[in-house]
């Protein structure tokens, strides 16, 4: 299954807030009507697990195959499979760029990476899924137009409080990864155990 490229508000109305997918919000009236309709129906356990999985996939902008691969890696790692899964996704380079406020969404961050604008430890990295690690330093290509774009994004989209695993130096346009993210700083409201259960027969 390919990465979703359709209307983002359609996904938001169905799955609620996904900050990585879009910063837009649906109109309250239509949104509340959809919520009322959905709450009046009995939802199966499979549907609940499916929707949690879809939240994760659309928020991080993954294909079905990519997400399944991350689940399989998480199962082989030490610790809670769900927590490891979220940590792996949060430490992707495109998500780090998004969480630093350098891009308004994860698709926007992915575009910066794909175009070769991002440096990790002074080396150009153009792979959005690149796994970042503690002590990595994230910078941008030294280009006035790019700096102006990043500054605008930071002014508009940098969160009031960065997650504690990240530090950002605005004058240098430099991000620093302090540690692996703690689960309480994950921006997406998700029940990761339901995602693991969904894939229990496939991973």
Curated annotation (Swiss-Prot):
Keyword terms: Chloroplast, Plastid, Ribonucleoprotein, Ribosomal protein, RNA-binding, rRNA-binding
Family annotation (Gene3D superfamilies): Ribosomal Protein S4 Delta 41, Chain A, domain 1, RNA-binding S4 domain
Chief location of this protein within or outside the cell: plastid
Domain S4 RNA-binding: 91-152
Domain of life: Eukaryota
SMART domains from the UniProt entry: Ribosomal_S4 (SM01390), S4 (SM00363)
PROSITE patterns, per the entry: RIBOSOMAL_S4, S4
Gene Ontology BP, a term: ribosomal small subunit biogenesis
Gene Ontology CC: chloroplast; small ribosomal subunit
Molecular function terms from GO: rRNA binding; structural constituent of ribosome
Region: Disordered, residue numbers: 18-42
Transmembrane segments: none
Subcellular location: Plastid, Chloroplast
Ranges of Polar residues composition bias in the record: 33-42
NCBIfam families named among the record's database cross-references: PRK05327.1, rpsD_bact
Physiological role: One of the primary rRNA binding proteins, it binds directly to 16S rRNA where it nucleates assembly of the body of the 30S subunit.
Subunit structure: Part of the 30S ribosomal subunit. Contacts protein S5. The interaction surface between S4 and S5 is involved in control of translational fidelity.
Similarity field: Belongs to the universal ribosomal protein uS4 family.
Record-given protein name: Small ribosomal subunit protein uS4c
Organism, scientific name: Pinus koraiensis
Phylogenetic classification of the source organism: Eukaryota, Viridiplantae, Streptophyta, Embryophyta, Tracheophyta
Gene: rps4
